Structures are given as C-alpha cells and as structure tokens.
Amino acid sequence: MKKKRFYIRTGILLVLLAALGYTLYSAVFQNTESVAVGEKAPIFSLEDVDGNRLKLDELKGKGVFLNFWGTWCEPCKREFPYMANQYKVFKDKGVEIVAVNVGESNLAVRNFMKDHGVNFPVVLDKDRQVLNAYDVTPLPTTFLINPDGEIVKVVTGEMTERMIHDYMNMIKPEGSS
C-alpha cells in the first residue's frame, strides 16, 4: 500500500515538474511576437473620438510613432506632454503620432485629451484587435515605423522627452529638415 502511494505521488510530481518545465521553456525560448523589427507594420483602420477613420496605410511615406496607451496608465500620462511637444516639432517634417487607446470609452478618452492638451491623432481600439495584432502586453508600448511601413524599433515602457525626440528624428523621412 505504501509503495503504491509512493508511485502515485512520484508520478504526480513528475507531471507537475514537466508542466513547469514546459511553461518556463515556452516563456523563455519561444518567440511569441506577432510583429518584429524589420517587418511590415500590420495595417489597421480605427476611429477617433469624433468618428473619423484613420487608416495606417494612408500614412505611408511618413514616419509613424505608434503609441499604445490607457487613461489609467501613469507612465502614459507622463509621456503625453512630451509627445505633444515633439509633435509640434516633427509634424511638418513628415512624422505622425498615432496614439491607440486600448478598450476605453469615448468619454474617458475625450476627457483625457482635453485635460492633457493632446494635439495629435488618438484612435480607439475598443475590441483590442490592433493591440492583439501588435502583441502589445505592457502599456505604454511604442512602435516606430519608417516611411516604408517597416517597424524599426519597439519601445516598451515610459520614455523621456529626449528619447521621443531622438526616436521621431530616427523615423522622419529622408530629406526632411
């Protein structure tokens, strides 16, 4: 009887260890990114708070600073003034900001925009399809897209104003001053 119990416990322990090992292997060694640097950015079409449709492929020829954010996200709140300042500098140099709000209401986003003086396009990803297409986990996450529509860098986490300036400079079209 004791021997049978020993084998059952050992079997259960081995199954648990195998499951743990597979989970760790999957998390560490398998690349689950849907998009990566050097790939074409997934095309999407989303509406802003006023119902106007923004299509990513219509921005081809411009550098795109694609930022995923939420009104509840403290680092996002700190980044927005920096993004607004740099948008003033780069919007006439062929760089566009597209801020993708994730899963929030028009009212919440509209109030946030008013409170933070947002001067760049903000679109709503209410069903999180674009978030999932880009495989975004933490907020904020920013994709830098060159004028050819290729992802050149992915930035996870909060950025300083200097970083935002440098990244926008990196994606501006050649020949822009």
UniProtKB/Swiss-Prot annotation:
UniProt-annotated location(s):
Cell membrane
Q: Which InterPro entries match?
A: AhpC/TSA, Thiol-dS_OxRdtase_ResA, Thioredoxin-like_sf, Thioredoxin_CS, Thioredoxin_domain, Thioredoxin_ResA/DsbE_sf
Where exactly are the transmembrane stretches of this chain?
A: 10-29
CC per GO annotation: plasma membrane
Identify the keywords attached in UniProt to this record, alphabetized.
Cell membrane, Cytochrome c-type biogenesis, Disulfide bond, Membrane, Oxidoreductase, Redox-active center, Signal-anchor, Transmembrane, Transmembrane helix
Q: Does the keyword Ribosomal protein apply?
A: no
Give the protein's recorded name: Thiol-disulfide oxidoreductase ResA
Which organism encodes this protein?
A: Bacillus licheniformis (strain ATCC 14580 / DSM 13 / JCM 2505 / CCUG 7422 / NBRC 12200 / NCIMB 9375 / NCTC 10341 / NRRL NRS-1264 / Gibson 46)
Q: Which gene encodes it?
A: resA
